[in-house]
UniProtKB/Swiss-Prot annotation:
GO terms, molecular function: hydroxymethylglutaryl-CoA lyase activity; metal ion binding
Name by which UniProt lists this protein: Hydroxymethylglutaryl-CoA lyase, mitochondrial
Sequence positions bearing N6-acetyllysine: K48, K111, K137, K179, K324
Pathway, per record: Metabolic intermediate metabolism; (S)-3-hydroxy-3-methylglutaryl-CoA degradation; acetoacetate from (S)-3-hydroxy-3-methylglutaryl-CoA: step 1/1
Domain of life: Eukaryota
């Protein structure tokens, strides 16, 4: 009994320390998070069955109604490469433009930029990578050559007063190269920032990252680029998306990409889950007292709508749980 009595205070001290650590971690969280909804573009682009234009438009309008302030609407790529995005101009022209909401579109080159602007785009996104092999297999050039292509886009965007967002894929791992050096991610991110991208989204393309790897990567990147110019884009292939996102928030990132209903698979891991579900992200942020401006019920309705249209189950744990209640 005496031994147990002596052991108890030590255990209590341990619990108190744990509580203190987690409280101090929570103190570093942002009061507000901007969610960039990528479902209509990143989520739908790999769907085998073509989604009708009216369905895409209704989905985006429902997401706007839910209070999301940034909704990536479509991609101005060649229909030859991404047939799902062939109706990009019709979608961008057909959606309701809500005040205070931006509707960026992804573009691969200057031709895509010009088509996007002609369709009324006010913001565009460009896509790079921290992996040489991934870049070579995706766009058939080196990282340096890809930036030469981006240069023309950024100059044209500046002249047209169009905001440009950059994506860096494979920041926590590559399907071809494996581990990626944090220094390489920092180098590529710094290049995007110095060229004029107002925000750079750091993507864990194959979802292999863990909070420790996320911390190391962000520590390197934040030595070159201010946290206010960074976003994270986590995939849930290994179930780490929310944990990695929380680590990024604790380190000062306040912009997070996510996809309604978790739309968007990982093309490098058959059957694996893809994007972080927006519903799950909002639920976590609300639980932490972080403002998002998003109405979770309306968001769930948007997720339910698109899942019915696709004849598939949602990947959102929150949506799955609430439909059972």
């Amino acid at each position: 009994m005496a031994a147990m009595t002596k052991a108890l205070p030590r255990r209590l001290v341990g619990l108190a320390s744990l509580r203190a650590v987690s409280t101090s971690s929570m103190d570093t969280l942002p009061k507000q998070v901007k969610i960039v909804e990528v479902g209509p573009r990143d989520g739908l682009q790999n769907e085998k069955n073509i989604v009708s234009t009216p369905v895409k438009i209704k989905l985006i309008d429902m997401l706007s109604e839910a209070g999301l302030s940034v909704i990536e609407a479509t991609s101005f790529v060649s229909p030859k490469w991404v047939p799902q995005m062939a109706d990009h101009a019709e979608v961008l022209k057909g959606i309701q433009k809500f005040p205070g909401i931006t509707y960026p579109v992804l573009i691969p080159n200057l031709k895509g930029f010009e088509a996007a602007v002609a369709a009324g785009a006010k913001e565009v996104s460009i896509f790079g990578a921290a992996s040489e092999l991934f870049t070579k297999k995706n766009v058939n050039c080196s990282i340096e050559e890809s930036f030469q292509r981006f240069d023309a886009i950024l100059k044209a965007a500046q002249s047209a007063n169009i905001s440009v967002r950059g994506y860096v894929s494979c920041v926590l791992g590559c399907p071809y190269e494996g581990k990626i050096s944090p220094a390489k991610v920092a180098e590529v991110t710094k290049k995007f920032y110095s060229m004029g991208c107002y925000e750079i989204s750091l993507g864990d393309t194959i979802g292999v990252g863990t909070p420790g790897i996320m911390k190391d990567m962000l520590s390197a990147v934040m030595q070159e680029v201010p946290p206010a110019a960074l976003a994270v884009h986590c995939h849930d292939t290994y179930g780490q998306a929310l944990a990695n996102t929380l680590m990024a928030l604790q380190m000062g990132v306040s912009v997070v990409d996510s996809s309604v209903a978790g739309l968007g698979g990982c093309p490098y891991a058959q059957g694996a889950s893809g994007n972080l579900a927006t519903e799950d992200l909002v639920y976590m942020l609300e639980g932490l007292g972080i403002h998002t401006g998003v109405n979770l019920q309306k968001l769930l309705e948007a997720g339910n709508f698109i899942c019915q249209a696709l004849n598939r189950k949602t990947s959102s744990k929150v949506a799955q749980a609430t439909c059972k209640l």
